[in-house]
């Protein structure tokens, strides 16, 4: 019998829930007034977060504190909240692109990252039955020993029953102790995942040139969107009529350590397995 491993909810400190929470709703735009898609919104130190829609809309329940708005193409935004708000407009400023870096010399095509040994019969899943897994993140750790230019990011989804599923790939440089995860992307990487009970293999070639300096990196897979109308229809369906795998996405599990984020902007936690991301490209000699 196939084992389904669902990554479990991490308990938040009880003190978070002792504070009064209230709803904040709004829209996120750029300096031209155009919507900014899939912004991570929340309070990182409390582990509270969500992801805005493709239209930049967001809704979150928080205590009085400062909301943060994170997107790889924009400077981090901050907004203090102390009362409910139904019509908040957040304007994000575009980040400046770093100067191009050119490295001479010979290159060798190779894999920077491979999954490890597969945990046969086990799968890891994302659950969108309540829309709560938007922002959940898991991936793999890679070590670049020499400068490395990423050309392909590969992963497999074994089945997906989440309509409108969009995933995001992120790349973080790991620095310091305690570990700090710094997102090095300047352009987002998204992929649409079709509804299918069959295997789907993805080979993503980033639009921007991603040159890794020697060091440790966390390459992650995150759910950022799903069809909320489908979520509502699922919730209205009697439990006896639901398919056990409806509104769920599954991947294989591999024996190689990684990190896991329960929700958008929550802290990253060590886990002993990963979901099988591979990275290949050119290593400079």
Spell out what each predicted region is:
Residues 98-174, 222-285:
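Beta-sheet-rich sandwich/jelly-roll-like modules and their strand-loop junctions
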Residues 39-43, 67, 102-103, 169:
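Hydrophobic beta-strand segments
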């Amino acid at each position: 019998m196939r084992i389904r491993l669902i990554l479990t909810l991490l308990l938040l400190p009880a003190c978070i829930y002792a504070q009064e929470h209230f709803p904040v709703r709004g829209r996120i735009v750029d300096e031209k007034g155009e919507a900014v898609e899939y912004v991570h919104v929340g309070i990182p130190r409390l582990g509270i977060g969500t992801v805005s829609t493709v239209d930049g809309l967001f809704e979150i329940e928080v205590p009085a504190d400062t909301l943060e708005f994170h997107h790889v193409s924009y400077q981090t935004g901050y907004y203090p909240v102390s009362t409910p708000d139904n019509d908040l407009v957040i304007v994000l400023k575009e980040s400046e692109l770093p100067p191009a870096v050119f490295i001479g010399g010979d290159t060798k095509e190779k894999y920077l990252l491979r999954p490890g040994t597969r945990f046969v019969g086990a799968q890891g899943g994302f659950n969108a039955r309540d829309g709560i897994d938007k922002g959940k993140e898991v991936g793999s750790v890679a070590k670049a020993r020499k400068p490395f230019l990423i050309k392909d990011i590969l992963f497999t989804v074994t089945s997906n029953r989440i309509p409108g599923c969009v995933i995001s790939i992120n790349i973080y440089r790991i620095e310091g102790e305690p570990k700090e995860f710094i997102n090095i992307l300047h352009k987002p990487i998204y992929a649409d995942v079709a509804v299918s009970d069959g295997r789907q293999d993805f080979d993503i070639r980033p639009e921007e040139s991603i040159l890794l300096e020697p060091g440790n990196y966390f390459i992650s897979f995150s759910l950022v969107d799903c069809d909320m109308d489908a979520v509502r229809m699922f919730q209205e369906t009697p439990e006896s009529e639901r398919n056990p795998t409806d509104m769920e996405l599954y991947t294989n599990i591999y024996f190689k350590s990684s990190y896991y984020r329960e929700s958008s902007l929550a802290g990253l936690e060590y886990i002993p397995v990963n979901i099988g991301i591979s990275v290949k490209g050119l290593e400079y000699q």
